[in-house]
Amino acid sequence: MRKLKFAMIILAVLMISAVLLTGCKDDRVVIKVLYYLEASAPNAVADANLWFSTFEKNNPGVKIDRENLFDDAYHDKMRTYAAANDMPDVMYVWPSGRSDYLHDQKLLKDLTPFINRDGIKNLYISLTMDPSQQQAGYMAMIPQGITTTHAFFTNLEVLNAVGLQPAKNYAELVAQVPVLKAAGYQTILIPAQSTWVMQSCLFSMVAGRFCGPDWHERVNAKRAKFTDPDFVAALDFIRQLYADGVIDRSQVGVDYGEGPGMFASNMGAYYIDGDWRVGAFITDSDTGQALISPAKQNNIKIGVFPDIPGTKINSSSSVILGVGYAMAASIPSGSDKEKYAWELVKWLTGKEVSELRTERGGTPTPSRTDLNFGAMNLEPMQKAIGNLGGEFQTATAVIDGVFPSSVYEVINDGLISLALAQKTAAAVATEVQRAFDNL
């Protein structure tokens, strides 16, 4: 009898334990996110934490499993996930270029049915809702905005210190090199250790000027070649920039993250980067500190590279759809995971996040059309970058947005070789054409 009672007690304890364990089970839907985050950028960490924690609060049935990476580390991890067929549920992606393999392999879900169902298409700039602008040929992601990949920052304080004015053309720029050098300044800063930087932020603009606005279309249609004189001349101009000392060869060894600090420290008169980089200079809401204080930001002018001799056009920059968010095609249709993954994409590109991202410097030209810019507290450099579109007349292609990686990576490497005087422009052009012919 005692044994029976003991057994019943043990059984009761086990049943209670099972109930308690069941009650403690986390039944939330886990959304795995691969997020692109430069932790050192002002507001970046705090803003990301706010966006994702707010989403979880508003959607108690969801748990966000977020992995934060930046630059090449991000792209390497994304390729690893794709190769292993173990995609994140939601990810930060490019409309082409460095995410081309995700588009080509159809690893991203078509968002068109969700966009149409929720009636949000008219809340975005029409270009960002055009599927032909994405390499997949369908709405594989929702872009945060429009990106100008070439911006030319001018430090008036440095120029004034040596009695110079902003250069209007390349000849004036070359003439400034010895004056600036004698005073301990570099002329143009561009952190080019990551090979995409020179291609995206400088050479795409240069190629457009030498070859004309539609040059990439003619090459892809095989009506023009990379070995044609105009493209070779564009490549040779990169060599000339370094040969003339306009850009010091040491810049090839500068990490991308170091560029803003160098410019803010008055190490150079000019700085080349994309429009997004303004976010690195503004005030961090947590610390109250800025790389360049709002008062000193009035000394920074933002436009495009001065006129270059021998080109077909000037007053131009390179423009492309901005980065944005996508869902893995592998998510089962109609599942709770799909439901919440879409809600997260919609939230990250929605009005509330877009307004905060714009005000905090993350998106200079947002894709949303319903934002209240008048209520935003924008610093001088943010206003200047917002007006960048008025500083040039022609928008040309970004190379890694119109050619596959097997071609643009050869260009990327070739630009570094030109900077270091290791190859001629003609030799690089031949290598690029060979890569294109092998497609």
What residue spans do the PLM features occupy?
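Hinge/lid segment of periplasmic solute-binding proteins
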Residues: 70, 94-151, 165, 174, ...
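Glycine-centered hinge/linker elements that transmit conformational signals in sensory
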Residues: 177-179, 220-251
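Extracytoplasmic/periplasmic solute-binding protein
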Residues: 134-144, 150, 174-223
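A structural signal for short loop-to-beta-strand junctions that line the ligand-binding cleft
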Residues: 80-81, 88-89, 119-157, 186-187, ...
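C-terminal capping/gating helix-and-loop segments adjacent to ligand/active sites or protein-protein/ligand interfaces
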Residues: 143, 219, 319, 360-371, ...
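Mature extracytoplasmic/periplasmic domains
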Residues: 24, 39, 97, 108-110, ...
